[in-house]
Amino acid sequence: DIEYAGGGNDWEEIPVRGKVKKVQQRSYVAIAKGPQAVDKGEKKGQFFVYEFGENGRKVKEERFTEAGVCREKIQYEYDENGNLSKESHYTPAGVLTVNKNYGYDKEGRLKHCSILDGKGEIMQRDVYRYDIEGNMVQEVGYLTNGTKCSEFRYIYDSYGQQIERKVLLQPEGSDPVGSVRRGYNFQGRVVFEEYLSPDGTSQSQHTYRYNIKGELVSGTERPEGQTEEVKYVYKFHNDNQGNWKIRIKYIDDVPVVYEEREYTYY
């Protein structure tokens, strides 16, 4: 997810080390070939392409289906304070579909977002509200006729970490958005997540463990429709900058996901 307010950079979010200009991720079903060797099967999983400016902010992104087919391309622009000011969405063929323009107050807090279609007609305006600590606590979307079309409420712990997203009004037309609950470690990384369906029932639960670099190394997941928790472990092959080139996910010592990344550095 894009962090709207300035501060930090998108390298830290992934996380990657060094001055990365571009990272491309592909994912496959893993196939065991003997005790140690693992092959790539069919394309399946998380695919993306990110391009960064020299300051580590994301300037371009490509989003894909689970089968590795490009869905859309996005460009990000920033104001002189480093805040995200414009987000432009394109089809894979390069046709503009949506523009999002972000506005901030003098404290640098995101206050509103105007969503325009490819012809430049405004479709929706989102408004954000904050608590006394400066945490974003409410996000409300309005259509051009003033009708409320979506509403989210955000809850924080005493460290200002978002521990719950509540869906008060489901956005129309999009895939159903459920509520999310989260817990954090001392480094501020998410160690627990629970996704709830729109009716409030638990859909899936996840726990995460990280190494000192902030990379996810193991965890548990209880997928939708299952009662048993599954433990998984990642094994890495790194490049000379310390970023992983290959990451293999194991469940019960059996490889299940094979992911690879390509990096371009400044």
Where are these regions (language model features)?
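Buried hydrophobic residues that stabilize the cores of well-folded domains
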Residues: 1-266
